[in-house]
Amino acid sequence: VKAFLAALLALLGATPASARELTVCADPNNLPFSNQAREGFENKIVEMLAKDMGASVNYVWWAQRRGYVRNTLNEAKCDIWPGVASGVDMVATTRPYYRSTYVFVSRAKDGLAGLTLDDPRLAKLKIGVQMVGDDGSNTPPSHALSRRGLIDNVRGYMLYGDYDRPNPPSAIVEAVAAGDVDIALVWGPLAGFFASRSPVPLRLEPVTPWLDAAQYPMIFDISMGVRRDEPQLRREIEQMLARHGGEIKALLESYHVPSVAG
């Protein structure tokens, strides 16, 4: 009897097993991908995965600047990094869950349809392009314009934008709407989301050719990133991404993300 009572008391006093937690690296001010209010589509996808895992979501908020991966995922401060280009060297990546492209953004009323990187009209236009820095690590459209001698009529907009304001990457799309530039070359998910909110109707068309000078693609597959020593987690996330493929597709469409067939 004493043994039974001791076992019963132990059970009654036991605390529940720790619930599983999915810790996510994310930028707190980077719509349409993520923000601290969890309004981005990456936030929503993470919530889908966590629900499937029976886990709660915890965020490590860190502005996506140089050193982002080194200071977050590689320091084991978080488990996954959503929205990373498939196959990057610094992390292990899952199979992609969407594929998008850089796009030309112009005012619909200007009739700038059918542009390509080699279109002679570009020489006469004010062009906006997303920039990273001056050390050779710029965006593919920036390199493509430079290779064609399109420099004097190009205005750079920092990829990260002014972090002191909400939605810092939106500045380049707003510049098109305001007429500060005639056309801009913008990463599709950013362009689609902010163009959908613009009071000025905007036209979006994929940048072509999609591969410039062999090393500058305009189309990217997007994956989740995990540490290389977490192959089991990577497989688990891949399985969940596959199970929720239809929901993810609908979610991306609701955020106006341009999709490219694989």
Task: Tell where the protein language model's regions lie, with residue ranges.
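Ligand-binding clefts/hinges and TM-proximal coupling segments of bilobed small-molecule sensing domains
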Residues: 56, 133-160, 235-262
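Bacterial N-terminal signal peptides
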Residues: 6-13
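Extracytoplasmic small-molecule ligand-binding "clamshell" domains
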Residues: 19-90, 162-166, 254-258
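Hydrophobic residues within well-ordered alpha-helices
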Residues: 49, 71-74, 120, 175-177, ...
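Short helix-loop capping/hinge motifs at secondary-structure junctions, enriched
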Residues: 109-117, 134-135, 151, 229-234
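Periplasmic-binding protein-like
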Residues: 27-30, 99-102, 111, 156, ...
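A ligand-binding cleft/hinge motif common to bilobed small-molecule-binding domains
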Residues: 67-68, 74, 82-92, 177-216
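Flexible hinge/capping segments at coil-to-helix
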Residues: 107-132, 143
